[in-house]
Amino acid sequence: RERDDILLVNIDDAAIEEIGAWPWSRDVIADILIRLREAGGTHAVFDIEYLSPGQTGVNRDYVRSQFPQDYREVQEEILSYIDEFATAVHDGSIPKDYVPEISEEMISYINSRLGGLSDEITGNIFRDNDAYFADAIAFFAHTYLTINTERINENEDAVKAEQWVRDNLLFSNVVDPHRLIDAENEKTRKDSQFEKGISPAILSLIQRVAGAGFPNVYIDEDGVRRRIPLLVEHEGAYVAQLVFAPILHILDPERMVRKDYRLILENALDPADPASGVRRDLVIPLDEDGRLLINWLKKKFSVKDNPEEGSFKSISVFALYACDDIEEK
C-alpha cells in the first residue's frame, strides 16, 4: 500500500539545469540535507556512493556575507587613517620633519591590516566540503549512506572505513542456522568482477551516520527491478539493504531469523504504529533465491509533471536548494 510519509527527492534534469552539471560539490548536498531537516524530514537515505574524498570548495557563505563586511571594515579603516594623516599634514598638525617617520608607521600599519585580511581570506575562503557534509549528516541525525557489498576500494583509508563499519554498523542479531543467506549471496555474486567484501562511504562521512546499507540492485531478465536481497553476510555480521536498514532501526527487532523462504523479525515494533511500543513477530516472505519480491503498485513509479500520480510522492531537489535564495531575498 502507499505511504504518504515517504518522499523521493530527485536529482532531475530541472535541478541539474538550475544548479549546474552533475556531480555537484558536497556542500550543495549538505545544504539540501539541512533544508530537508528544517522542513520536517526524519530519515534521509542516500543512494549516492561516496567512495572517495570530495574536492575542497569555496565557502560561499563566507564569500557572500563575511568577506564583504571584513573587506569594507579594513578599507574604511585604512582610508580614514590616510585622510587623517593628509589633513594633519595639510593643516600643520604634523611638523614636516616628522612626516617621513609617521609615514613609515602608517605603511607598517596598513601592511599589517592587509596581511591580516589576507590571512583571514586564505583561512576562510576554502572549505573542506567533506567535513561540512559530515556536519550536515550529523545535524540531520537519521542519515543513511551506502556500504557496497563488493570490495571496490583497497587503499588504507578504505580499510579503516571497513573496520569502523564492521565494528559499528553491521547487524549481529541475525540467526541463519543453515547459512541460506551466505549461499544466496554467493549465487548473486557469481558474475561480479570484484572480490567479496564491503566498500563503505569514506570514513569521515560514514562515522557520522545513523546507519548504512547496500545499494546493489539486481535486474530480472525483462529489465525490471522487482527482487531485492535484504541481507548480505560479511565476516559473521550482516549488511542490510539500503532502505531496509532504516526500517530495521525503526522496528527494532530483537532478532532476525532466516527460515526457508521467510525472514522473521522477532519481537519487532508494530509497523503500523512503532511509537505505541507494541511488539510482535513480523514475517517477510522471500522468493526461491531469498529475495524480497516487490509488489509494485499499478501506477508509474514517478510522474514528472504530476508527482502525486506516482507510486510515491516526489519533488525535485531544486525545491530544497532554492530555499537558500528565497531566504536571502
What are the roles of these predicted feature ranges?
Residues 312-329:
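A Trp-anchored, charged/polar loop motif used as the substrate-binding/catalytic surface
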Residues 24-26, 307-317:
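Short intrinsically disordered coil segments
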Residues 1-302, 328-329:
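Non-transmembrane functional regions of envelope-associated proteins
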